[in-house]
Amino acid sequence: MSYLVVTIKVILITGMPGSGKSEFAKLLKERGAKVIVMSDVVRKRYSIEAKPGERLMDFAKRLREIYGDGVVARLCVEELGTSNHDLVVFDGVRSLAEVEEFKRLLGDSVYIVAVHSPPKIRYKRIIERLRSDDSKEISELIRRDREELKLGIGEVIAMADYIITNDSNYEEFKRRCEEVTDRVLKNG
């Protein structure tokens, strides 16, 4: 009896708010990857369980306090279900506990890709993108960055297997994303 063994590759996208994580995820989806946006998974739970007036970030913090630091990763893997994709992407990894949980649940073919943009560029993008949960005040954006860093996102970025710098035009960013994706798919 023989078994068909299919190896999937998993990309964990990390980066500060406004760095270009979602754009990278969109490009990966266009290449056929299954993409799960971690904040969407949290938002789904938030819509059911949040306390009145509770901010999304505070809700996520409370989830981690109750269920452990890897809870969002576990919820995302549950959301994945049975996937027949060769490449699975989790957009928005914020802590090493999440990275460890993904590796525990999905095996060793897990790669961290950090998207980096300078703060001035990120803040400009955030102010222009018009997401409902984005602040338009620089002081609030700086506070949000600090909250992300307290969660451990800086440690995840430091442990990245690949870093994509997003400080130029879209075509250059796309080229850099394609280069990293090809390297992950070819060699890991």
Swiss-Prot record:
SUPFAM superfamilies membership: P-loop containing nucleoside triphosphate hydrolases
Alphabetical UniProt keywords: ATP-binding, Nucleotide-binding
GO terms assigned for molecular function: ATP binding
Annotated positions binding ATP: G15, M16, P17, G18, S19, G20, K21, S22
Tree of life domain: Archaea
A Pfam short name: AAA_18
UniProt similarity note: Belongs to the UPF0200 family.
HAMAP family, sorted: UPF0200
Protein name: UPF0200 protein M164_1169
Source organism per UniProt: Saccharolobus islandicus (strain M.16.4 / Kamchatka #3)
